[in-house]
């Protein structure tokens, strides 16, 4: 069985790491490179960087920091933000990123997933899905351009349908960003994760809601996700990655202990 992964997420805006709640009201956390190094040293399995306004601004991720991150960490990392072409992806990978993630551009042009997978291999193509639970309808809907709250919009896709669609098109991994839980630290949406897990046959990463070590355990044990992504609990040093992994290992989770 493959080891479960602990993945700190670094949202990047204007060259700094920021963090919001439910994708809004972002506060500055700090500089990119020192944070990346700290997480690698603590035992993170990989890192994810989101240039959160790249897609809504109509630009590609700011590449200036990608190579600097690659110089100071020795774990895999994934970069996302406005990647709309093979050329964009090739440049980011050439700067040292191990994976690229697409979200809003995939919704705008789903063929991009296939073209990227054919060119670079499915193993380095991640599709991020920003999903919102509508309490009135009881349905999960995919949102687009979530990095800028003034431009965020609900798409015509229901989450489970989009999960199936991106797999058909060549997604090698899916990160499910559960917007209702984002930054609230009340736990992952296990019900939604279980529904997605039932139709997701590639690695599935849970994102949004981690507040305690038990929340990570629940995601691995009850929803059978392959990785758990979190931000604020690591940024604010509420949870230490090394201690988290020791806890999970003691609970019987297959994990790489530092």
Swiss-Prot record:
It catalyses: 5-[(5-phospho-1-deoxy-D-ribulos-1-ylimino)methylamino]-1-(5-phospho-beta-D-ribosyl)imidazole-4-carboxamide + L-glutamine = D-erythro-1-(imidazol-4-yl)glycerol 3-phosphate + 5-amino-1-(5-phospho-beta-D-ribosyl)imidazole-4-carboxamide + L-glutamate + H(+). Pathway: Amino-acid biosynthesis; L-histidine biosynthesis; L-histidine from 5-phospho-alpha-D-ribose 1-diphosphate: step 5/9. GO terms for biological process: L-histidine biosynthetic process. InterPro entries: Aldolase_TIM, His_biosynth, HisF, IGPS_HisA/HisF, RibuloseP-bd_barrel. It is found in: Cytoplasm. Signal peptide: none annotated. GO terms for cellular component: cytoplasm. Pfam families: His_biosynth (PF00977). The keyword Lyase applies. SUPFAM superfamilies: Ribulose-phoshate binding barrel (SSF51366). Its EC number is 4.3.2.10. Keywords: Amino-acid biosynthesis, Cytoplasm, Histidine biosynthesis, Lyase. IGPS catalyzes the conversion of PRFAR and glutamine to IGP, AICAR and glutamate. The HisF subunit catalyzes the cyclization activity that produces IGP and AICAR from PRFAR using the ammonia provided by the HisH subunit. Belongs to the HisA/HisF family. PANTHER family: IMIDAZOLE GLYCEROL PHOSPHATE SYNTHASE HISHF, IMIDAZOLE GLYCEROL PHOSPHATE SYNTHASE SUBUNIT HISF/H IGP SYNTHASE SUBUNIT HISF/H. This is Imidazole glycerol phosphate synthase subunit HisF.
């Amino acid at each position: 069985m493959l080891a479960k992964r602990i993945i700190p997420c670094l949202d990047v805006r204007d060259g700094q790491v920021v963090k919001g709640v439910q994708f809004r009201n972002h506060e500055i956390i700090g500089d990119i490179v020192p944070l990346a190094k700290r997480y690698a040293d603590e035992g993170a399995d990989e890192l994810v960087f989101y240039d959160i306004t790249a897609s809504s601004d109509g630009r590609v991720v700011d590449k200036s920091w990608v190579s600097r991150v690659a110089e100071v960490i020795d774990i895999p990392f994934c970069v996302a933000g406005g990647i709309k072409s093979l050329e964009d992806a090739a440049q980011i990978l050439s700067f040292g990123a191990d994976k690229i993630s697409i979200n809003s551009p995939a919704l705008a042009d789903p063929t991009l997933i296939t073209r990227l997978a054919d060119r670079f291999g499915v193993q380095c193509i991640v599709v991020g899905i920003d999903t919102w639970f509508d309490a009135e309808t009881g349905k999960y809907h995919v949102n687009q351009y979530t990095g800028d709250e003034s431009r965020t919009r609900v798409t015509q896709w229901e989450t489970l349908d989009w999960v199936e669609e991106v797999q058909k098109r060549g997604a090698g991994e899916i990160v499910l960003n559960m917007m209702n839980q984002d930054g609230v630290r009340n736990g992952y949406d296990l019900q939604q994760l279980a529904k997605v897990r039932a139709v997701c046959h590639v690695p599935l990463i849970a994102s949004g809601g981690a507040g305690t070590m038990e929340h990570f355990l629940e995601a691995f044990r009850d929803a059978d996700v392959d990785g758990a992504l979190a931000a604020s609990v690591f940024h604010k040093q509420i949870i230490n990655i090394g201690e988290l992994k020791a806890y999970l290992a003691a609970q019987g989770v297959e994990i790489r202990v530092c």
